[in-house]
Structures are given as C-alpha cells and as structure tokens.
C-alpha cells in the first residue's frame, strides 16, 4: 500500500496522518509498515496487562486456563514509554487474559495514549465484567478514544444475559465497540494429547504462516516479540505448562530496547519463522462450550 493509501486508512479511522510525512511505507509486510524520521512504524501491536482470565475456554491461545499473573502498573508503563521511543503502531491493543482484571488499567490506557497520540487504541474483553466496570476505567476509555472489541465466547441464556448487560453499558456511555462472534469462529491453537495436555501441530512453517491471521507483535517483559501467539507459547514453556514438544519455540529471540534501528527493521521484515511449524496449516473450528480441564488442575505464574 502506498503512502497515500495509508493516509486514507488513518483518515477513515478519524485520525490525523501527519505521522506519515517523509515516510517510506511497505504495507505488504504484516508487521513492518515503514519509517519516519525518528521511529519505526508497524501495523499491529499489543500488550497483555494480565494473563489471568475469568473464563476457562478450551484451546485458548493465551493458555489462560493454566496461566495467571498481572503486570505491575509501573512496570507496564516503563515498557510502553521505553518502546514508544522506537516504534509507532497504527493499531495498539490491550489483550490478555482479560484486561479488565487489571487493577489500574486506566493508568495503562492513559500512558498508551500519551505515548502514541494518533494510534488507534483497542481494548479486547469478553464483556462479562463490563457491567461492573470501574468509573475510572470508563472515563479513561472515553478520554483516550479507546475502541472496545467484545468477544462473545458462548451462547446460552445465562451467559447472554451477562454479556449483553455489558454491551448495554458501552452503549450508555457512547463508547465505540464491535462484537466478535468467537462462539462461531473459535479454533484450536494447539492439539491435546491422551493426557489432555497441549501439544503443538507439526506443520510446514510456510503453509502455517500463509494462513495465519494472528500476525500481531507484542511487548512483554520489555521485549518485542514478532508474534503474540509465539510469545504466549514461549512464556508457557518457560513456566513449565508446556512440555518438551514445544522446545522449538525457545529458539526465538525477541528484541530488547537497546536494539538498533536497523536490527528492528530487519526483525520485522523476516516473514515466515521456523517456529511457525507449531501452528496449524489449516484451522479447525470448534464450538467453545467445553471448559479446559488440565490433568493436574493447577495454575502457573506467567510473570515470574
């Protein structure tokens, strides 16, 4: 996509596009977009304020049924301020886990907007906590122009009552939101063996990369990961949740804040990774009505 098209995209999102003056744009790469005079521009980026979740969905790509933990607010702010000196995302998402479980989410939203004044900010939530959301978070969502993506995971009367109560709260406050029907498009990020433990696929890396739609980088532990899903897998393996079958993920090296501009661009330009082989070549969709049951039924700390 040429520079003019990117400007048109930002304008359609209600954002100014002076960011792209004197910018070389490479839209055909899923992560790397281009560079301006000071920072590298990327298409999608996310953070996980918490990996804990109030749901226990089977085949969750974040392994949140088994992992838990919340990033301290000052630590998350430090990550954002550090990396904002090097990169500018067009789209920046707060995911997890369930981000509304973070006790100071409003501070994280405020700092993110201060770091990236023209970036589209999006909060991903399963919606069940929206009806009880703190006023401070609502006010932060509004003043920082944060859009909300509500993921609907199940479809039964009791769940729907709670879910749409949260959606109604967004309507009342005039917050921009959209709904993702995860109950219709939920797929397996991994397989389960005879012991009900997660095991990776054994795919052709190029084929898995080609069909992948989750090409979103993530900042975690003050490092930049090329792929959010890969970041989850690495952390879960390091925590002992995943077995030795996942060791190939550990070969990936995320970027640290002391990387050079050239190293950053090269990292975002690399395309298919050998580690892509742990993901499916073709997604298998399921109905996410079954909760995850781990053989040991225990949680592991995600953040050390």
Feature roles, as predicted:
Residues 102-221, 225-230, 235:
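Conserved AdoMet/S-adenosylmethionine-binding subsite of the radical SAM
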Residues 194-304:
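Accessory C-terminal segments flanking Radical SAM cores
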Residues 12-14, 20-133, 298-304:
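Conserved alpha-helical substructure of the radical SAM core
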Residues 1-12:
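Boundary detector for helix-to-coil junctions that initiate low-complexity/charged tails
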């Amino acid at each position: 996509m040429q520079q003019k098209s990117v400007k048109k995209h930002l304008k359609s999102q209600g954002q100014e596009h002076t960011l792209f003056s004197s910018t070389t744009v490479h839209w055909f790469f899923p992560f790397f977009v281009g560079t301006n005079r000071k920072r590298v521009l990327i298409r999608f980026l996310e953070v996980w304020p918490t990996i804990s979740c109030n749901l226990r969905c089977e085949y969750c790509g974040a392994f949140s049924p088994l992992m838990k933990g919340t990033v301290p607010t000052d630590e998350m702010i430090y990550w954002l301020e550090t990396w904002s000196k090097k990169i500018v995302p067009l789209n920046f998402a707060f995911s997890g886990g369930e981000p509304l479980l973070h006790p100071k989410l409003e501070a994280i939203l405020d700092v993110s907007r201060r770091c990236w004044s023209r970036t589209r900010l999006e909060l991903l939530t399963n919606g069940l906590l929206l009806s009880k959301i703190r006023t401070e978070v609502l006010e932060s969502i509004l003043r920082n122009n944060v859009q909300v993506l509500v993921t609907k995971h199940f479809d039964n009367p009791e769940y729907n009552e709670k879910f749409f109560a949260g959606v109604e709260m967004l309507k009342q406050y005039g917050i921009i939101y959209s709904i993702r029907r995860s109950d219709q498009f939920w797929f397996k990020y991994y397989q389960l063996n005879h012991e009900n433990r997660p095991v990776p696929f054994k795919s052709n890396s190029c084929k898995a990369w080609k069909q992948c739609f989750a090409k979103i980088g993530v900042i975690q532990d003050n490092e930049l990961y090329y792929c959010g899903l890969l970041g989850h897998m690495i952390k879960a393996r390091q925590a002992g949740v995943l077995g030795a079958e996942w060791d190939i993920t550990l070969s990936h090296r995320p970027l640290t804040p002391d990387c050079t501009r050239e190293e950053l661009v090269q990292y975002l330009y690399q395309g298919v990774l050998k580690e892509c082989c742990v993901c499916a070549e073709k997604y298998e969709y399921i109905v996410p009505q079954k909760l995850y049951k781990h053989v040991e039924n225990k949680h592991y700390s995600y953040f050390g």
